[in-house]
Amino acid sequence: MTQLFYDTDADLSLLNNKTIAIIGYGSQGHAHALNLKDSGMDVIVGLYKGSKSESKAISDGLKVFSVSEACEKADWIMILLPDEFQKDVYLKEIEPNLKEGKILSFAHGFNIRFGLIKPPSFVDVVMIAPKGPGHTVRWEYQNGQGVPALFAVEQDSSGSARSLAMAYAKGIGGTRAGILETNFKEETETDLFGEQAVLCGGLSELVKSGFETLVEAGYQPELAYFECLHEVKLIVDLMVKGGLSQMRDSISNTAEYGDYVSGKRLINSDTKKEMQKILKDIQDGTFAKNFVEECDKDKPLMTKLREENSKHEIEKVGKSLRSMFSWLK
């Protein structure tokens, strides 16, 4: 059984007398910065000139500097920028300010795993990745709880990188819930696979195909939306709370029987083979290469696909129906 680590396993005092620079102040950035600040740490924020987040960070009681200035002042640098922007910002603003003894950290391993960022040997390189969105990380911390997190060490120059990563995880509230040790390779590959094969790519296409099948068979689009998209959350919430078994305990016998006899007709050995191909593209760097090239061209394919998908009938129907649900407003 994989070992989990909690508050008593991590020493927050290791962060004393260290200035922590949070680079970026979006969903994760604001949560990391404020949780660390409330844990008694010296936190500053690094943003590009003219960032819309600057006024928010200042109103939250944080000192804001340019990315370069923040990295120069900091002992610990946490990069919380979108994957496609990290390399350029690192080369121009962060790398010139790295000195022996500093800690470079990430919340996702993409740029390290695929060699886009290559830190010098004299810094620690670690990862602390909460398994939840930033607003949840902040909310849970404020309520005396925490969001589980992953932590990893890629490079241990100081000899204390593992303990430091665990201390940071404690500072943002992760050890209240439990933290799990991994490595950059494992975190990156599993995260990308989950997004592509199940959570985003797989689920989106499953929902659309189900909707299309019903509409093409003559059923009302509104009913197709309810059955194939709206109710997804009801089932997923049950799965998250108690696993597949509890979900099946909570649905009707008719639904459970249909689950067993029809699910495998859709998700079968051929589907799994395709999943394995997706995983291979992630492992051998094909996906990363294609994504980087797409971003270098200013995302023409992604923009085209985004526009096409936004025009799908399910989006039009959903926009109308969501106004019926007061809790979604």
UniProtKB/Swiss-Prot annotation:
Pfam families: KARI_C, KARI_N. Its cofactor is Mg(2+). It catalyses: (2R)-2,3-dihydroxy-3-methylbutanoate + NADP(+) = (2S)-2-acetolactate + NADPH + H(+); (2R,3R)-2,3-dihydroxy-3-methylpentanoate + NADP(+) = (S)-2-ethyl-2-hydroxy-3-oxobutanoate + NADPH + H(+). Keywords: Amino-acid biosynthesis, Branched-chain amino acid biosynthesis, Magnesium, Metal-binding, NADP, Oxidoreductase. Substrate binds at residue 252. Residues 183-328 form the KARI C-terminal knotted domain. GO terms for cellular component: cytosol. Binds 2 magnesium ions per subunit. Its EC number is 1.1.1.86. It comes from the Bacteria. Residues 2-182 form the KARI N-terminal Rossmann domain. Mg(2+) 2 binds at residues 191, 227, 231. NADP(+) binds at residues 25-28, 51, 53, 83-86, 134. One of its GO terms (biological process) is isoleucine biosynthetic process. The active site is at 108. Belongs to the ketol-acid reductoisomerase family. PANTHER family: KETOL-ACID REDUCTOISOMERASE, MITOCHONDRIAL (PTHR21371:SF1). Involved in the biosynthesis of branched-chain amino acids (BCAA). Catalyzes an alkyl-migration followed by a ketol-acid reduction of (S)-2-acetolactate (S2AL) to yield (R)-2,3-dihydroxy-isovalerate. In the isomerase reaction, S2AL is rearranged via a Mg-dependent methyl migration to produce 3-hydroxy-3-methyl-2-ketobutyrate (HMKB). In the reductase reaction, this 2-ketoacid undergoes a metal-dependent reduction by NADPH to yield (R)-2,3-dihydroxy-isovalerate. This is Ketol-acid reductoisomerase (NADP(+)). The lineage of its organism: Bacteria, Bacillati, Cyanobacteriota, Cyanophyceae, Synechococcales. The gene is ilvC.
